[in-house]
Amino acid sequence: SGRALQILIRRGYDKYKEFMGGVIYEDPWFAGGHCGFSNTDEVGKPQTPYHKIVEIRQVLAQNGLGDVPIIIAGGVWSLQDWQDYIDNPEIGNVGFQFGTRPMLTEESPISQAWKKLLLHLNLDDVVIQDFSPTGFLSSAIKNSFIMKLFDRKNSEIPFSKEQTSEFSEPIVYSKNTTYYIRKEDMATVDEQHKKGKTCLSVTPDNTLIFLSVDEKMQDMEDIKDCCGCLSACKFSAWSSHTGTTGKLPDLRSFCIRKSLMEVGHKGNILDNILFSGKNAFKFKTDPLFNRGNWPSIKELIDTIKKGL
């Protein structure tokens, strides 16, 4: 937003404005990976970025940076979709960042399995969700890894440590610990047990989630192997400031370092996080990617320069 940019200029660039080479505007609804939603953005209601980009240009001009280019990222597939932004005096110097489309090029280092998956995605196969251990929303492909986390989140139930009229049904948490849940949640317990989800985990929100024995063992192993890659991690409860966030590890999340490392080194594409921009479904109908072979980066750039 323009307000955020003004704060950044004041704090980091006020005395060094000549070093600002450009400002990247990343559309939170269409970009892949972590999403930069503001407090006023509604996740389920995508907005055109035009007015926000004009606001950014106005802030730059007010700070003597009127010629600094704005780089538009997120949802950029072809330049013909952005004609209203090019040679537009309200926006000024502008550039475009392509993040999703180059993934299916000959030079792209992702695995062949990952490339083939991208080629067959539908519009609803990329979802914005809150599973990242960073605490930010992120956009990723809805594979079995993401669906597992959705299942954990959607089946979580409240509990009480004491038996009450509302929380009347006992459920064994461990050898020496019994919790109590509501009668209406017993159906969820039965459903999860039929799926093999017989282990329980307490979340930081004082709810119970269901995991298989193997899933819980793997998550405990991942927490034990935490290397502190984040300043604060929702999954492991690590904090670089105090050693712990003071909360329970949240198994509705995952070890992001492990998952990105695995899939980045030709690991299983179904059991790891696959960040993706919302427009990945366009691969299926883009003639450049339906010739039986992957185009080179040069071919992609030549196509982009034609506006296609």
Regions found by a protein language model. Name each.
Residues 1-4, 67-81:
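Glycine-rich beta-to-alpha transition loops that act as phosphate-gripper elements at the mouths
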Residues 20, 28-46, 59-67, 79-81, ...:
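Conserved active-site-proximal phosphate/metal-binding subdomains
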Residues 48-52:
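Short secondary-structure boundary/capping elements
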Residues 5-9, 53-57, 82:
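Generic structural signal for well-ordered alpha-helices
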Residues 1-29:
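Active-site-facing alpha/beta catalytic cores
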